[in-house]
Amino acid sequence: MTLSFDDAAATVKTLKTSPSNDELLKLYALFKQGTVGDNTTDKPGMFDLKGKAKWSAWDEKKGLAKDDAQKAYVALVEELIAKYGA
């Protein structure tokens, strides 16, 4: 079964176990790239560690087409469903 991007975004919130921080950052970056496109926002301040991590993860996806980011997001969500259950 292949999920749509919207279904994957909804399903990831129902995982039985919370993904690791690295997995959450990957999800965030692919979601933002798949919905917004390249990161053009200002980098958060040096004391905003969580914001900087999220910003950097998204910025690393720069140049990835929205469609490709959405496909990668769905694939990652499907892996997480297999790993953690939904």
UniProtKB/Swiss-Prot annotation:
GO terms for molecular function: fatty-acyl-CoA binding. Keywords: Lipid-binding, Transport. InterPro entries: Acyl-CoA-binding_prot_CS, Acyl-CoA-binding_protein, Acyl-CoA-binding_sf, FERM/acyl-CoA-bd_prot_sf. Gene3D superfamilies: 1.20.80.10. PROSITE patterns: ACB_1 (PS00880), ACB_2 (PS51228). Binds medium- and long-chain acyl-CoA esters with very high affinity and may function as an intracellular carrier of acyl-CoA esters. This is Acyl-CoA-binding protein homolog 1. The gene is acbp-1.
